[in-house]
């Protein structure tokens, strides 16, 4: 069977296939690690009201870092120093988890 016949048969069965050419990366968020597919080639297949995605690419796994600072400390540093969450966490790391020192480091 050639690809043209396959597409025609799929159309007769009500199956629609769409290449998602603008997708470059796919990330699946797991409990302990993330699965990242780079150089992704994604095809969406629609059949019987359901959408299924076929993903091809280069898989890499990234373990999640256990957050060691309380949400309250992070928010306090963010609000007082007027910085992003990432900057607040970096400042807390540099200040050994001490919010007051993190704020002083960011504002002075």
UniProtKB/Swiss-Prot annotation:
Keywords of this entry: Protein transport, RNA-binding, Transport
UniProt KW Glycoprotein keyword: no
Ranges where the NAC-A/B domain occurs: 1-68
Coiled-coil regions listed: none
Single GO MF annotation: RNA binding
CDD domains: UBA_AeNAC
Entry-linked SUPFAM superfamilies: UBA-like (SSF46934)
GO biological process, one term: protein transport
SMART domains documented for this protein: NAC
Family (UniProt): Belongs to the NAC-alpha family.
Subunit and interaction comment: Homodimer. Interacts with the ribosome. Binds ribosomal RNA.
Function: Contacts the emerging nascent chain on the ribosome.
Cited NCBIfam families: archaeal-type nascent polypeptide-associated complex protein
Protein name: Nascent polypeptide-associated complex protein
Phylogenetic lineage: Archaea, Methanobacteriati, Thermoplasmatota, Thermoplasmata, Thermoplasmatales
């Amino acid at each position: 069977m050639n690809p043209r016949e396959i597409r025609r048969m799929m159309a007769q069965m009500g199956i629609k296939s769409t290449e998602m050419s603008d997708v470059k990366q796919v990330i699946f968020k797991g409990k302990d690690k993330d699965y990242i597919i780079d150089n992704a080639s994604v095809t969406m297949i629609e059949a019987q009201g359901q959408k299924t995605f076929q993903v091809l690419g280069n898989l890499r796994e990234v373990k999640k870092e256990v957050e060691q600072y309380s949400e309250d400390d992070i928010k306090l540093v963010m609000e007082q120093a007027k910085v992003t969450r990432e900057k607040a966490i970096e400042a807390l790391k540099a200040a050994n988890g001490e919010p007051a020192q993190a704020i002083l480091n960011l504002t002075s």
